[in-house]
A protein has these predicted regions:
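…; additionally, a secondary subgroup of soluble metalloenzymes is captured
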Residues: 1-468, 478-628, 632-865
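Beta1/beta-strand and adjacent pyrophosphate-binding region of the FAD-binding site
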Residues: 472
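Ligand-binding pocket scaffold of soluble enzyme catalytic domains
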Residues: 475
């Protein structure tokens, strides 16, 4: 600033009227940099005297101002700074005087409203390069609060260089680590170096994390931080040999920092850092010596998932399938942040546990002597094994899309064990039982008596209906898939849903099953051009003729294709069914997928469930339909593992006698008597042909692929055709009003089970319980649980509860959560709250009052002091 500008400023200030009770004005001109010490002769003031402090004339100046001259205005030029206020002999005069500064530091401090004292001024000078740019000063002004102490100013500068508004140690540390572990390549750390903030950064790290090295390194800091944090849930002795990276006194802060990162939005960066730490510390080799229980609650390292999964998979391969260990471990791990990276492996093992539990329940095997009873047991219980197998293979196939070199081969060994349990024990045992008890009736009648028949579908469900009926026929939707669909419809829609079954016609292939679902008095078969055609009362039942067959019985009928409907506008859809009493909608996702590859079938089942739910919504919303039937033409058998020669039967014994055959059925001339096949009466014996089927899961040898996914035979999986009766309940319906609580689907709720409301440790646990079992009208929900102070500020980490338990036994619906309080001071007279909130934010939060009484609680770190 030019001296004439200074003179102008000072004269202007002396011209201002004096405050009340003041007789003169004294202005202290601070110039610690002595920029104007040699220019004082140029200062000529209109109505004030100038006196300069030299360091040796302080007493004389004080005497002059206090005794000798009590009326003159003065400018006291002060080029001296004092570390301690008591060293300033003129302090009492300064306190009632005005201050004036001409240096850039003063201007910056004034601009930012930073308290002007020696310690703050010294620090602003230290960061002169930083404050020299308006854009960087603007970042300080944009922060949540004005720095009032040197520590806050250090953090404000670092926060500005990080590009964040919260000048908090956690935020700064995490942003630096997110920039990479190589100091030379980390842009944030290099900006610290450029603007002289690196020493402050390492001082903050030293006090907060306990990491102190002569040559500090970001990679070593990451190792120290994550390992120290892990000792909160992992016993320190498990990390023997890594003591130099551990600081137990700083454990709470390191855990809090890592926990905050774990629950942030940039998990991939933490994943990379955690993998780096694992490699540098050789963690997999150390931790693989521990038990699953030792590791189950530690989440910061991804390798822990690989170790846990490896141990469980190895045990399964060794024929050790501990259902409780697997289910409890998966329950603990699924709330951890890296679960999504390993979801397919965990969920696959959970299905193995379900299969093993089923095996234990039926360890005596399958020996029911009555075919009708076997059918009933399959429809009510046994089908669950098919679902577990399907869900396992869904997880397995998805795991192949995200390869993990440490787990892939082990998971494939698990597949081998699953195949043994499912294919040989379940399909083999149940298949033999069923084949044995149904053989006579199948030979004599072509069906099992006293079981509803697919060929009666139209007469049983459509003809008696007193309102419009819409039928969805999903090709190859077997019973267990329909059971999953029915469960989801109950939970997701306001409806009454019943699941029933009927025995599919033989052979269980599309052209026969689709024909059986059409109206008819008699089904016959006609051989034409070496192709067996199925006729309903003499009419073709091919897909192009089904609309005609339906209209022949009721002109107000129509046959539609799902794939056509889905692409139409709402008005176009509605026009198709306007005035119709009977609507058949054909859906083909599962069977169509089998034509691509056998392994596409189970993913197609998942898609089919979603598509069928969508079709139900379209019928309700666009068609105004309330009564919907969902069924299939047939089911299917599927096994993943390659079949052996023992799983096949040669057709040489009936060569030249076959009219048509597939891998699971054969239609032959009446006089045929093939070996190794069961006779099945064909179409009530009203044709010149007879039928045969392999026992259990045996396939007939033939050229081409498609050995693993098959249908056409008499197994329960192929012949148990589902019938879902779906009745949509409108709000005004009598049934809904009478049973509103039954039909309204609500999320299950979670409440605190522990009785104590006092916390006396930084680490503690609480028990919670799920009030209702997940059922038809109670859906699973995920809850987040944490502690806050009376102002809502979190004072603990956050735990997750996945409330999806289906057991009717309340003792099975409990959850045990471990909490860690933040490193701060707690008051035993203040009120704290446990908060239970659903993850979607759709329910009102639950709050429980707590007292926190910790004798030696750690106060918040006062960095740099």
């Amino acid at each position: 600033m030019e001296t004439d500008k200074i003179v102008l400023d000072l004269n202007r200030r002396f011209a201002v009227p004096l405050p009340e009770f003041y007789e003169r004005r004294i202005i202290f001109w601070h110039d610690e940099e002595k920029e104007y010490a040699d220019k004082l002769d140029e200062i000529r003031l209109e109505n004030a005297k100038l006196v300069a402090l030299t360091g040796s004339n302080t007493f004389a100046v004080k005497k002059m101002l206090s005794v000798d001259d009590l009326t003159s205005n003065y400018v006291v030029y002060c080029p001296i700074s004092y570390e301690r206020q008591e060293d300033d002999w003129l302090l009492d005069i300064e306190l009632y005087s005005e201050s004036y500064r001409t240096d850039a530091v003063s201007n910056w401090m004034q601009e930012l409203d930073i308290l002007d004292n020696p310690s703050m001024r010294k620090l602003v000078k230290h960061y002169r390069k930083f404050f020299g740019a308006q854009a960087r000063r603007a970042k300080i002004m944009a922060q949540d609060k004005i720095p009032a102490t040197p520590a806050q100013l250090h953090m404000a500068v670092m926060a500005a260089l990080c590009g964040i508004k919260k000048a908090q140690p956690n935020e700064i540390l995490l942003n630096v680590l997110r920039g990479g572990l190589d100091k030379a390549q980390n842009p944030i750390y290099q900006s610290f170096v450029d603007y002289s903030a690196e020493e402050a950064f390492w001082a903050m790290v030293r006090q907060g994390c306990g990491y102190a090295e002569e040559e500090p390194d970001l990679g070593q800091l990451a190792i120290h931080l994550l390992l120290t944090a892990s000792t909160r849930t992992l016993r320190p002795e498990f990390l023997a040999g890594l003591e130099k990276f551990l600081s137990i006194p700083h454990q709470a802060y390191c855990y809090e920092l890592v926990s905050e990162w774990l629950h942030s939005d940039d998990l991939q960066q933490l994943y990379d850092v955690a993998r780096y730490v694992e490699d540098e510390a050789h963690l997999p080799q150390r931790l693989e010596k521990l038990t699953v229980d030792d590791l189950a609650t530690t989440e910061c390292f991804p390798c822990i998932n690989e170790i846990i999964l490896s141990k469980l998979m190895t045990e399964i391969s060794d024929h050790i399938i501990d259902v409780d260990v697997i289910t409890k471990t998966v329950e603990k791990r699924r709330t951890c942040v890296w679960y999504e990276y390993f979801r397919n492996f965990y969920e696959g093992l959970l299905q193995v546990a379900n299969m093993q539990e089923f095996f234990k329940e039926h360890s005596a095997g399958f020996h029911t002597p009555d075919a009708k009873q076997v059918w009933k047991e399959y429809a009510e219980d046994y089908y669950r094994m098919d679902t577990y197998y399907r869900l396992f293979h869904l997880s397995f196939q998805r795991s192949l899309e995200t390869s993990n070199i440490k787990l892939d081969d082990l998971f494939k060994h698990v597949v081998d064990k699953v195949e043994g349990l499912y294919s040989y024990w379940f399909l083999g045992g149940l298949g033999k039982n069923w084949s044995d008890v149904c053989a006579d009736e199948m030979a004599e009648h072509g069906r099992v008596l006293e079981i509803p028949q697919q060929s009666d579908f139209y007469n049983e469900y459509i003809r008696p209906a007193d309102s419009r009926v819409l039928v969805i026929i999903s090709d190859a939707m077997r019973y267990e898939v329909a059971a999953s669909l029915a469960d989801e419809l109950r939970r997701e829609t306001q409806s009454n849903v019943k699941l029933g079954s009927m025995q599919g016609i033989f052979p269980s292939i599309t052209k026969f099953g689709m024909a059986a679902l059409l109206p008819h008095k008699a089904l016959t078969a006609e051989l034409k051009n070496e192709v067996l055609n199925v006729l309903a009362d003499g009419q073709s039942t091919a897909s192009t003729n089904r609309d005609k067959v339906l209209k022949g019985v009721n002109p107000a009928s129509v046959a539609l294709q799902y794939k056509n409907i889905i692409g139409m506008k709402r008005a176009e859809r509605a026009a198709l069914v306007k005035g119709m009493d009977v609507v058949y909608i054909y859906h083909d996702t599962i069977d169509e997928a089998s034509h691509t590859s056998d392994t596409s079938v189970f993913p197609a089942c998942d898609r089919a469930i979603s598509e069928l739910k969508n079709m139900v919504r379209i019928i309700v919303n666009d068609f105004g339909g309330a009564n919907i039937l969902i069924t299939a033409d047939h089911g299917f058998l599927y096994t993943y593992s390659p079949l052996t020669e023992d799983d096949k039967v040669d057709k040489t014994s009936f060569h030249d006698m076959e009219v048509e055959y597939g891998r699971r059925y054969a239609i032959m001339q009446k006089e045929a008597n093939p070996q190794y096949l069961l006779p099945v009466k064909f179409l009530d014996g009203k044709t010149e042909y007879t039928g045969f089927a392999p026992r259990e899961g045996i396939r007939i040898k033939m050229n081409g692929g498609g050995l693993n996914f098959v249908h056409g035979g008499i197994s329960l999986q192929e012949m148990t055709v589902p019938v879902i009766e779906y009745h949509y309940l409108r709000n005004g319906s009598m049934e809904y009003r009478r049973n509103k609580q039954k039909y309204d689907t609500l999320p299950v709720t979670v409440s605190l089970l522990s009785s104590s409301r006092k916390i006396s440790n930084m680490i503690f646990s609480l028990d919670f319980y799920q009030k209702d079992a997940v059922s038809a009208n109670r859906e699973a929900a995920t809850y987040l649980v944490w502690f806050t102070d009376e102002y809502g500020k979190p004072v603990s980490d956050t735990q997750k509860i996945i409330a999806d338990k289906t057991s009717e036994n309340g003792a099975d619906r409990t959850f045990h959560c471990n909490f860690n309080l933040k490193s701060m001071k707690f008051s035993n007279t203040a009120t704290y709250y446990l908060v239970i909130a659903d993850e979607q934010g759709q329910q009102m939060q639950q709050r429980e009052q707590f007292q926190i009484d910790i004798a030696f609680a750690i106060d918040e770190f006062d960095f740099f002091n």
